[in-house]
């Protein structure tokens, strides 16, 4: 059955790119509502659907959605990953400005808040998007692809010249709470040279060594080092789950990303929905629903994960 959060939960922090204070609150919603964002600092046209066709194309450093009036919310990928990875199908996300707070750079604060509140089952079945045929998009060396599968798998490969990251590959079945155990604590990352360029262009003004993994060659500059030896590829998988959640329903698919980013994953969803024969909507029976992301999440997964960091 569809779910929502039992009661509101609030998060306070700063926007990664703006550096401005930001507050976000996740509210319960009724069945069939889906996920919507609402700007509380805007008087009219404040609602934005968390959907693939609301994403502004070509934005590289984050996922930014906009409504027909031009009202925007940026950096939604981590909170979307947390909602998807915890199995929340319906919620209203209120934010008091144009950017979701970055918090610690991962999705674990959002996950902790959602799991602490718990979920409420709603009187409506879950519908999923079943992939029937491969869909692939490319940009240079980057590839994003969806293949048929009876559950959501994410395969990801990255390559960076900085040896602190290097080449990393990981595959994960997203069922049975694996997002919480394996991915949600992995932080956004960047190279020091990229930080310098972003700062020169007025970006990443809220970024610090406490909310991002910054590397310079073989050196990890962030205090405490890495949470996982392959934290970078895990974070790319986290981002991918958040961006795929903008499909509007859980995906039964195998997603493969090779050096892919936010813009390419959105391009993949646009390609998918432009090919109606490549997918179908299915009403999930109990067996199918048990294979979706977020099913089986336990509160004990979070402290067990945190102790491993």
List each language-model region with its residue ranges.
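C-terminal regulatory domains involved in ligand/effector binding and gene-expression control
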Residues: 1-90, 94-309
């Amino acid at each position: 059955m569809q779910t929502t959060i039992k009661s509101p939960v609030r998060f306070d922090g700063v926007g990664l790119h703006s550096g401005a204070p930001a507050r976000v609150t996740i509210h319960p919603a009724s069945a069939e509502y889906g996920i919507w964002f609402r700007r509380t600092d805007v008087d009219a046209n404040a609602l934005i659907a968390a959907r693939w066709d609301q994403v502004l194309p070509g934005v590289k450093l984050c996922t930014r959605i906009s409504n027909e009036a031009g009202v925007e919310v940026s950096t939604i990928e981590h909170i979307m990953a947390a909602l998807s990875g915890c199995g929340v199908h319906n919620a209203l996300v209120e934010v008091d400005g144009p950017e979701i707070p970055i918090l610690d750079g991962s999705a674990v604060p959002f996950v902790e808040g959602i799991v602490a509140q718990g979920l409420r089952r709603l009187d409506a079945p879950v519908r999923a998007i079943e992939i029937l045929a491969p869909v692939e998009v490319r940009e240079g060396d980057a590839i994003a692809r969806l293949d048929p599968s009876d559950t959501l798998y994410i395969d990801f490969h990255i390559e960076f010249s900085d040896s602190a990251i290097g080449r990393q590959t990981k595959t994960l079945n997203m069922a049975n709470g694996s997002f919480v155990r394996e991915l949600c604590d992995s932080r956004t990352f960047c190279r020091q040279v990229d930080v310098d360029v972003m700062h020169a262009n007025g970006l990443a003004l809220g970024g610090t060594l406490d909310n991002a993994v910054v590397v310079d060659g073989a050196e990890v500059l962030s205090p405490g080092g890495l949470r996982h030896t392959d934290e970078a590829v895990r974070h790319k998988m986290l981002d991918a789950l958040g961006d795929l959640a903008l499909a509007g329903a859980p995906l039964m698919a195998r997603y493969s990303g090779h050096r892919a980013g936010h813009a390419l994953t959105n391009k993949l969803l646009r390609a998918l929905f432009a090919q109606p024969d490549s997918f179908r909507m299915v009403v999930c029976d109990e067996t199918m629903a048990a294979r979706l992301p977020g099913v089986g999440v336990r509160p004990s997964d979070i402290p067990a994960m945190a102790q491993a960091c």
